[in-house]
Regions:
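A short, glycine- and basic residue-enriched loop/turn
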Residues: 4, 8, 41-42
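Enriched for short, Lys/Arg-rich terminal
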Residues: 2-6, 13, 17-24, 54, ...
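A short, surface-exposed loop/turn module that caps and links secondary-structure elements
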Residues: 28-53
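Short hydrophobic/aromatic-rich motifs at helix boundaries and adjacent loops
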Residues: 1-2, 12-13, 29-33
Length: 86
């Protein structure tokens, strides 16, 4: 049984600002990690969140192991995605 993926409002808005072909690729790649996300992600330094690399873009994730849920927190280019993370 795989994880459930929940896109936050902020991550959906981030996707709208990205070119459609790139956004589709990001969505497709996030769906791929549903089975076992820990094979593909790295822990975000100084945080309980994780990062997932998709080309020049990064996807910030919050993973709840007990409930098998992946929250997509933020999506953006590497140079700006790490700003203002809370």
């Amino acid at each position: 049984m795989g994880y459930t993926i929940i896109w936050t409002d902020k991550s959906r808005k981030n996707l709208e600002k990205i070119p459609k072909d790139t956004a589709a690729r990001i969505i497709e790649r996030v769906e791929i990690i549903r089975g076992d996300p820990f094979l593909h992600i790295d822990r975000l330094a100084g945080s309980s969140w994780y990062k997932y690399r998709v080309g020049r873009y990064r996807v910030i994730l919050d993973i709840k192991r007990k409930t098998l849920v992946i929250y997509v927190i933020k999506v953006g280019q590497r140079k700006v995605v790490y700003r203002n993370l809370e």
